[in-house]
Swiss-Prot record:
Component of the ESCRT-I complex, a regulator of vesicular trafficking process. Required for normal endocytic and biosynthetic traffic to the yeast vacuole. It is found in: Cytoplasm; Endosome; Late endosome membrane. This is Protein SRN2. GO terms for cellular component: endosome; ESCRT I complex; late endosome membrane; nucleus. The keyword Membrane applies.
Amino acid sequence: MKVKATKLRIKQRRKNKGLNISRLDIIRAEMDVVPSPGLPEKVNEKSKNIPLPEGINLLSSKEIIDLIQTHRHQLELYVTKFNPLTDFAGKIHAFRDQFKQLEENFEDLHEQKDKVQALLENCRILESKYVASWQDYHSEFSKKYGDIALKKKLEQNTKKLDEESSQLETTTRSIDSADDLDQFIKNYLDIRTQYHLRREKLATWDKQGNLKY
């Protein structure tokens, strides 16, 4: 069908001019048809000025048409070689615009990177302050509530109770009445009871070691 359509188109052209159909007419007519979607429109406009391949006159009209129909893509590539460089220039400009857009995007990313780095630096500063505060708190806590501090405090309280009981014993000479004696016994027993309880705690502590949490 394509062969017949091509020949009819050529006959119509030559009929108007009073000329015969030649194989070159077939090739030019075939090259003058609308190209495939991937080929620019300028290929069709400039095809009449495209030189024919060398040795094309050795082929018959049917062979030429079959060759064109079978290898149409190669024909389009051949035609493309003779197009002006405007298409390539347009592509170059398009690529240049794309690169320019990428450059702008990169600058935006660079600014965002600087902001993120600033935030990270602030986070590092906060982390350093937190670590310093935690170390101070831990040190203060250990001084007041650590095993060593608690044991030392217990030892001091035990020693203080022993001293209080010794001082209380010195007041026995000043006891004049039964009521004073009862009060003395009550106070003395209370102090000595607390003293022995704390001594027992210290002994247990020394035996079992530091407290386990």
